[in-house]
Amino acid sequence: MATNTMLCLLILSVVLALAFATNKKGDEEPENHSTGIFGKVGRVVTVALAMSSRLGGADATRGGGAVYGGNLKSNLLPNNNWMAPPPPMAMRSAKVYDSKHSPAEYLKKFAQDFRRKTGMHSQRHHEETTLEQEKRVAGAGPDPIHHQDTTLEQEKRAVPAGPDPKHHEETTLEQEKRAVPAGPDPKHHEETTLEQEKRAVPAGPDPKHHEETTFEQEKRGAPAGPDPIHH
């Protein structure tokens, strides 16, 4: 590089000297003054460039490319592997499934992954429904076939009049009064008292049931007095 710059400076100095020498001669010949200066300067510049290019080419051939070798060395980075290609990437295997697992196991695993990602479940998962789920599905309540143990309260809600007497045969006197307005059935309650007979028969109790009558009762029954046969 130093030799090239020195040669260029030398050539420029020669060109300038020639230019000034031609200017002095041009003053002596005024008819060529308009075109002499610029034309001569242009010719000198082209000659200088041609000489510098020839000198540079000769030095390059003589030094075996030493001119450009220095530039290349100066452009090198600290990393010596800057032009090295990247390492080859690991190629994936073209097998659909691993050799350790059979195709059936691979398909089963694939189905499980698919159901987990999509949120789908098998039919066996949906068959296990609880009573709470049945209530939500059917607004009236669960199916009586599945739940046969019904209580008295549930039967009252199902039948407004009350539970079925076949299921609940032990009825009390109060329940019979509500069912029959006239009162309970005398067949169920045979032990009737005198007060109950008075309510049933306005004239009084039956003398067959109460044969032991007193003298006061006979007076009320017969105004003339008691029967002398009995007394």
From Swiss-Prot:
A--type repeats, residues: 127-135, 148-156, 169-177, 190-198, 211-219
Keywords: Apoplast, Differentiation, Glycoprotein, Host cytoplasm, Repeat, Secreted, Signal
GO annotation terms (biological process): cell differentiation
Compartments where located: Secreted; Host cytoplasm; Host extracellular space; Secreted, Extracellular space, Apoplast
Chief site of localization: secreted
Annotated GO CC locations: extracellular region; host cell cytoplasm; host extracellular space
Function: Mimics host plant CLE extracellular signal peptides that regulate cell fate. May play a role in the differentiation or division of feeding cells (syncytia) induced in plant roots during infection.
UniProt protein name: CLAVATA3/ESR (CLE)-related protein 4B-1
Encoding gene, per UniProt annotation: CLE-4B-1
